[in-house]
Amino acid sequence: MNDRLTPELVLSAYCQGCFPMADPETGEISFYEPDPRALIPLDDRFHIPHGLKRALNKKPFELRMDTAFPEVVHACARTDQPEEQWIDGQIEEAYGKLHEMGFAHSVECWDEEGLQGGLYGVALGKAFFGESMFHRKTDASKIALVALVQYLRAHRFLFLDTQWTTPHLLKFGTYEVPAKEYRKLLKRALEEQ
């Protein structure tokens, strides 16, 4: 692992509002602090699209947490678009160590054929930083996201940070806050246990 990307450095970066990504071409690790920052609401503004509600009612997957963390990260790293491969071996190793330390977590969707989708991220205080998601079967990553939101609500988290807004995440009510406001929210979330 690159000496620069220790678990302690990654945690310190999160506490300052930054997160690491590997350059898909060079493998160089850089830290980012988007302005504005995208958050998924954990209150009644969280929206489950109608079609997904139908899928949830069918209960197509068994939901698990932290039973296949390395597999989830590795699946998130595999993408058909090389320009989007920001998760490299250094990232996988650092987050694996964060998982062993109790900071990084996965939400997984399983069926009789195995792991079909999931997501992973980092929990610090009452903040959760969503990193990436994947699916092998329809709606698996979305169902994992809904399960994560339910978990975060039950444990009184203040926010779910998705870093940037995407069309996919907008369907769930994602909103943006200026970096200055984000840092205030982050400070409050880190002070709460």
UniProtKB/Swiss-Prot annotation:
Protein name: Leucyl/phenylalanyl-tRNA--protein transferase
Originating species: Akkermansia muciniphila (strain ATCC BAA-835 / DSM 22959 / JCM 33894 / BCRC 81048 / CCUG 64013 / CIP 107961 / Muc)
InterPro entries in the record: Acyl_CoA_acyltransferase (IPR016181), Leu/Phe-tRNA_Trfase (IPR004616), Leu/Phe-tRNA_Trfase_C (IPR042203)
NCBIfam families: aat
EC number in record: 2.3.2.6
UniProt-listed Gene3D superfamilies: Leucyl/phenylalanyl-tRNA-protein transferase, C-terminal domain (3.40.630.70)
Keyword Acyltransferase on entry: yes
Known function: Functions in the N-end rule pathway of protein degradation where it conjugates Leu, Phe and, less efficiently, Met from aminoacyl-tRNAs to the N-termini of proteins containing an N-terminal arginine or lysine.
Gene: aat
This protein's UniProt keywords: Acyltransferase, Cytoplasm, Transferase
Domain of life per record: Bacteria
